């Protein structure tokens, strides 16, 4: 981590701090820390996670959001910026309405935070884990593309601190809170571009649209065939009625002659 200044800031000063454009800062016990520029794989993993969580929340009609570049206050004068934050929609709307930096305060607790390891990986495994545990964040993921593993920290019932489970390549990582949210470790550690996923979904939607159009055309053809058959049946019935009427008339004529 890179300390910006030896002069300490309060949490309120941090909220209104105007640093270098494009640079993200954390606050650790009053010290301003410049976060390292993320690598390409770091960005891809974060974008992939946000995309998957948003799809999951939409599919299950959950009032939750997945956001990035959102800070979480962990101590009196400390604030961390997880790579991904999961919180309720109402909470996010409240934070969005506040002036200054987007920061979740003590009473604004996220449901899940995710860190993708980088140069300061020790902070993710030790210091940040302790801070997130201290403020009772229910679930904390550490995605480590260098060691090729994912650590999911959570607090089991009747336990006072985090325990964790690690997921390795070839396995599937599962959220503790969202049991149906399951991802391949291999895919998460080396994810596709979100743009490619969107293109695939668009292609699938177009294919489904074409299939629906074909089914609609087939239904229209069947309806036309049914109408033609109905017309033929009606014509045959009318023909039979005319024939029966003619036979009755002929029978009446014969009775008269006799």
Feature-to-residue mapping (PLM):
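Gly/Pro/Ser/Thr-rich low-complexity, intrinsically disordered segments predominantly at protein N-termini
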Residues: 1-258
